[in-house]
Amino acid sequence: MTFELKYTDRSYLPDQFKAISGNPPVEWKVTNNLVEYPEALRYMQERVENILAQNAHEQVWLLEHPSLYTAGTSAKKKDLLTPHLFPVYEAGRGGEFTYHGPGQRIAYIMLDLKRRRQDIRAFISALEEWIIQMLAKFNIKGERREDRVGVWVQRHSCQSTQNSLYSEDKIAAIGIRVRKWVSFHGVSINVDPNLAHYSGIVPCGITNHGVTSFLDLGLPTKMHDIDIALKQSFEQIFGPIIDIS
């Protein structure tokens, strides 16, 4: 099942999404080389089947992709503005078009929600809170919005010499799929990707907000430091991990 979440208040949902007592730690895997998208998709699908068969533990997989676009189940053809700029893949997750590429930290989340909470809305809220807490470690204020999924950064945007307005830009996208209550796909966080590569699509179908990154916000950050912060924040919300990298 894929899940579309729009116009829904998630602020009241609890942040904790820990597993039942006795659940093994979540495996934490980091791949440093670029991973082709079809390879990652095959891996996730196989892992989900093994989790369902109780032959594998839950896992978070951190990686980067080469430049590409993915289309979610709600993607509209008109939102692919430059079809031949990068490879385009059908993702099977919820959401619309998004960009993946070097400088973007991908976290694929393969969790058994039956061991946690069978509530996809609460799961998405917990993923957002995970990213918000990670960003706070770098003094970035990430925010969620009722009418759109993901994590957003608000900042001043001078549109003219007379007016100073706020702009809202997305720093992290979320797109998941759930099969028999086991999740896959996950989140993408813009660390220092080439933001011009988003020009080939309408990201997530949203035209009136932009995208940003750590570098764009004036905070050049090493991917290793992002990973440490992600790990610390994950344990606060989802529980213990074991590093298998």
UniProtKB/Swiss-Prot annotation:
Question: According to its UniProt record, in which pathway does this protein act?
Answer: Protein modification; protein lipoylation via endogenous pathway; protein N(6)-(lipoyl)lysine from octanoyl-[acyl-carrier-protein]: step 1/2
Q: Name one GO biological process term.
A: protein modification process
Question: Coiled-coil intervals in this record?
Answer: none
Q: What is this protein called?
A: Octanoyltransferase
- The record places domain BPL/LPL catalytic at 54-242
Q: What is its main location?
A: cytoplasm
| Gene Ontology cellular component annotations, sorted alphabetically | cytoplasm
Q: What family name appears in the similarity comment?
A: Belongs to the LipB family.
Query: What is a single Pfam family found in this protein's UniProt entry?
Result: LplA-B_cat
**What does it catalyze?**
octanoyl-[ACP] + L-lysyl-[protein] = N(6)-octanoyl-L-lysyl-[protein] + holo-[ACP] + H(+)
Positions with a binding annotation for substrate: R93, G94, G95, E96, F97, T98, Y99, H100, A173, I174, G175, G186, V187, S188
Q: Where is this site: Lowers pKa of active site Cys?
A: K170
Under SUPFAM superfamilies, the record lists: Class II aaRS and biotin synthetases
Q: Where in the cell is it found?
A: Cytoplasm
User: From the Swiss-Prot or TrEMBL record, what is one GO molecular function term?
Assistant: lipoyl(octanoyl) transferase activity
InterPro entries, sorted: aa-tRNA-synth_II/BPL/LPL, BPL_LPL_catalytic, Octanoyltransferase, Octanoyltransferase_CS
Key words of the record: Acyltransferase, Cytoplasm, Transferase
NCBIfam families named in the record: lipB, PRK14341.1, PRK14345.1
Tell me, what does this protein do in biology?
A: Catalyzes the transfer of endogenously produced octanoic acid from octanoyl-acyl-carrier-protein onto the lipoyl domains of lipoate-dependent enzymes. Lipoyl-ACP can also act as a substrate although octanoyl-ACP is likely to be the physiological substrate.
Protein origin, superkingdom: Bacteria
